[in-house]
A protein has these predicted regions:
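Walker A (P-loop) phosphate-binding loop of P-loop NTPases
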Residues: 2
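Walker A/P-loop
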Residues: 6
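Short amphipathic alpha-helical segments
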Residues: 10, 77-80, 100-104, 151-152
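NTP-dependent small-molecule kinase module
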Residues: 11, 15, 61, 87, ...
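ATP-dependent small-molecule kinase phosphotransfer cores
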Residues: 22-72, 76-83, 108-109, 121, ...
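Short glycine-rich anion-binding loops that position phosphate/pyrophosphate groups of nucleotides
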Residues: 70-72, 94-96, 144
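A glycine- and Lys/Arg-enriched "phosphate-lid" helix/loop adjacent to the NTP-binding pocket
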Residues: 84-128
Length: 162
């Protein structure tokens, strides 16, 4: 959430000349409604069910870059599918930087809170250990420009696939 998954993912896919997929966008395209609407009518659990089905579909595709929503890591099946079918990059970013990047974004249901900073910190506390346990590579997107992040990922990916 706000770490740069879509921005970095698109640039990475372009550099690798492979298709880019965003699981949240794919869910919106398949349902015809946006993520906040899914949360409103189905709740987070309903959204997570849809997300898991989409991850099952997308991880069957070869030679793609996939950006997932930040909560995809919460379900064990998603973690298994991602680890078995890809090179996982954790785009790490500080709470303050994420808050700065998302403060005007109205399309993030989990940040609709009286105190968004507290909410982000709570999400980090719930998820960070899962991100770290799944990651093949970790890069801090809060301290580098996106092009430098992409180059760093490319170097690591190429060395891991020799």
């Amino acid at each position: 959430m706000g770490a740069g998954k879509t921005t970095i993912g698109r640039q990475l896919a372009k550099s690798l000349t492979v298709p880019f997929y965003d699981s949240d966008k794919a869910i919106e395209e398949s349902t015809g409604v946006d993520i906040p609407t899914i949360f409103e009518f189905e709740g987070e659990e309903g959204f997570r069910d849809r997300e898991q089905k989409m991850i099952q579909q997308l991880t069957k595709l070869d030679g793609i870059v996939l950006a997932t929503g930040g909560g995809v890591i919460l379900r064990e099946e998603n973690r298994r599918l991602l680890k078995e079918n890809g090179f996982i990059v954790y785009l790490q970013c500080s709470v303050d930087r994420i808050l700065e990047r998302t403060r005007r974004d109205t399309q993030r249901p989990l940040l609709k809170a009286d105190n968004p900073k507290d909410r982000i910190e709570k999400l980090f506390a719930e998820r960070e250990h899962l991100y770290l346990s799944c990651a093949d590579f970790i890069v801090d997107t809060g301290i580098m420009q996106s092009k430098a992040v992409v180059n760093h990922i490319l170097e690591e990916y190429k060395s891991a696939n020799r």
